Amino acid sequence: MDSSSQKYLVKKRVKIHPNTVTVKYTSHYPQPGEEGYEDGNEDTGVFMEDSPKTRLLNAGKKRERTFFGTIDTQLQPAQLPKPREMGHFQNFPEGNILQSRKMWIVLFGSAVAHGCVALITRLISDRSKVPSLELIFIRSILQVLSVTAVCYYHEPPFGPKGYRLRLFFYGVCNVISITCAYTSFSIVPPSNGTIMWRATTTVFSAILAFLLVDEGMASVDIVTVVGSVFGVCLVMIPNIVKEENSLLSTWKEAFGYTMTVMAGLTTALSMIVYRSIKDNISMWTALFTFSWTGTVWGASTMFLLQEPIVPLDGETWSYLLAICLCSTAAFLGVYYALSKFHPALVSTVQHLEIVIAMVLQLVVLRILPGTYDLVGGAVILVSVVFLACHKLSWKNLGRQDYQEIVDSSIK
């Protein structure tokens, strides 16, 4: 043992228990006024030597920037609040309750709006025969007016510098998803296409969030997501099996369902991209990006791929305006919730669209849901209500905000 280590005394503490004897050794460093204390220059505040090992450790703590956000290269274990901190959270439960309730009201409202869009899309397809790309074009032109909100909040319409590429990529993903979804509705029954679109969006958002940004979910959230997807499958699969088609129609419908899967994949990807830039891009800027990219895409493709028509009657224009209003409300609700919740959870709540669409079809179109539709809708409803009750429970309100911030790797 060298002389430098011998000058510090080693103290031994013995703790005697009825069954065991614990010995603990601790190093004692001389304090000011004691023998062996060396007076260092405390004013400088520099006590760490600059060595290659130190530089390597410091470099390991730096943050790595990726296309989808900023991710820690060394993930620190999530630490729960201390009991004193939990007491601090419990001192202000009313604000947490109001904020959480507001968030869930917005989510449920967006699900209702999505259900209205599904019904109106079917009505305009059956009665007005408006092609899907023209529908996207007209909807996007009306949503371009969201630039007024962007200018009102003094935000750059095309996003701040450093985020424009990701914002443009987000808009392209959204336009591709809507195009694939609306195109599939002309090949497969719109109800089946909408259901598969929602189910694949939920599954892909959970997978992509984990793979791209390392954002996981709690075990209770996973159970509710799986239960809701199971309910969606109960509604969708029997409807597909009952269809009797020829070989050519089978291949055509296979292409249609492939388009819905692509719509779900690109929708999930757009949600992940927005979640990585949500701190710098507002939902109004995101809506404007979606609208102008949709306008450019619809104007350049609807004359090449489809035969557009000119809506002349007031009924068609009322459907178009209703679709625009409902889709805008649903869009803002979903992307407002994305700033708080995991994308898979947001998509799971939107499964209520299927239940809302069933009720609206029964009231407006007099279409009775089948047995599997009722069972699947009940499973979806129970899963979403259980998820909402779990998130709004008193014991989780204190740590919900803290835990989501700690678990998220997007800063």
From Swiss-Prot:
Q: Keywords in UniProt for this one?
A: Cell membrane, Cytoplasmic vesicle, Membrane, Repeat, Synapse, Transmembrane, Transmembrane helix
Localization per Swiss-Prot or TrEMBL = Cell membrane; Cytoplasmic vesicle, Secretory vesicle, Synaptic vesicle membrane
Residues forming the EamA domain are 112-237, 261-389
Name the membrane topology term. Multi-pass membrane protein
One GO CC term, this protein: synaptic vesicle membrane
The residues that cross the membrane are 104-124, 130-150, 168-188, 193-213, 217-237, 254-274, 285-305, 318-338, 345-365, 367-387
One Pfam family from the record = EamA
Q: Source organism's superkingdom?
A: Eukaryota
Q: Which family does it belong to?
A: Belongs to the SLC35G solute transporter family.
Listed name of the protein: Solute carrier family 35 member G2
Protein encoded by which gene: SLC35G2
